[in-house]
Design a protein with these regions (language model features):
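Processing junctions and N-termini across compartments
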Residues: 12, 16-19, 186, 248-251
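A conserved catalytic-core signature of glycosyltransferases
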Residues: 58, 194-196, 218, 227
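Flexible mid-to-C-terminal extensions adjoining Fe-S/redox cofactors in radical SAM and related proteins
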Residues: 1-8, 212-267
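Short cysteine clusters
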Residues: 18, 22-25, 192, 210-211, ...
């Protein structure tokens, strides 16, 4: 593997399916799909010279994937550092896999459980913390418990990361809105790290510049059909990167994305 990685991270969505329906999560317009093990292997082979750090998440619940163990083994064999974002409803069921193929970090979206009445919170919390204790005891996996600092019930200590114990954290974040070309917000001025520090690959192989493009609106190509070099050198990819060099969004979805305001200091 190349010692110098071009991207700090690449998001790889192994499934677009989810077992919850959260109000804050943008509706997925794509059909439910699971990336096959062979397809995932191809993805890893084709991004290997560009990064050694992947997030198994864009949309969907990665612990739903029936071949999760095989996927994590491919990552392990390729010396990939893996982050995994989950609602943790299946963490007890998938614990043997997570113990056999430990990941670098598991991000638990606690606000997902709070947003779904179908979840028995007592059972959820018990299974989550029991699984966390096992992982912390038997692996080097770091666990980040994420909460959103909402306007309705704000945390007094604001937005920050608090260490509970070694490798276990509470991460309080501000909510964000998924970009939508039909939203009232529109501003072509701004900055984004898409295709500079990160990019995303959807479960059908579609490459997009950013993990907030959950519906593949800015499809740059398909990594199962083309090399990443070919995709990144395409006219659309080049225009995207050149635009943000000038602090200008050229894609309609980016114009309607307020998340780029978080990088205003780079203007």
């Amino acid at each position: 593997m190349n010692s110098v990685a071009r991207f700090k991270r690449v998001y790889v969505e192994i499934t677009s399916s989810c077992n919850l329906h959260c109000s804050f999560c943008q509706e997925t317009l794509r059909k439910p799909h699971f990336m096959s093990v062979d397809e995932f292997r191809t993805v890893i082979e084709r991004i290997g010279h560009y990064t050694n750090y992947i997030y198994l998440h864009v949309k969907g619940e990665p612990l739903l994937h029936p071949q999760l163990g095989e996927i994590l083994k491919i990552c392990q064999d390729a010396d990939m550092t893996v982050n995994l974002t989950t609602n943790a409803t299946l963490i007890k069921e998938k614990l043997p896999v997570l113990l056999e193929y430990p990941v670098h970090q598991i991000n638990v979206s606690l606000h997902s459980a709070d947003d779904n009445d179908c979840i028995d919170m007592d059972s959820y919390i018990h299974n989550l913390f029991e699984s966390c204790e096992t992982l912390l005891d038997k692996t080097e996996t770091e666990i980040s418990l994420r909460l959103w600092n909402t306007k309705k019930e704000p945390f007094l200590f604001g937005e920050k990361i608090c260490t509970i114990k070694r490798h276990l954290y509470i991460n309080v974040q501000s909510p964000f809105e998924w970009p939508d070309v039909n939203s009232t917000y529109c501003n072509e001025r701004g900055f984004c790290q898409g295709l500079r520090q990160h990019m995303a690959i959807l479960c059908d192989g579609t490459v997009v510049p950013c993990c907030l493009d959950g519906n593949g609106v800015m499809a740059l190509g398909n990594i199962l059909d083309s090399t990443l070099e070919e995709i990144l050198s395409s006219p659309r990819s080049v225009a995207f990167m050149e635009g943000f060099k000038k602090k200008t969004a050229v894609e309609p979805l980016c114009m309607h994305c307020s998340f780029k305001e978080r990088f205003a200091h780079k203007m």
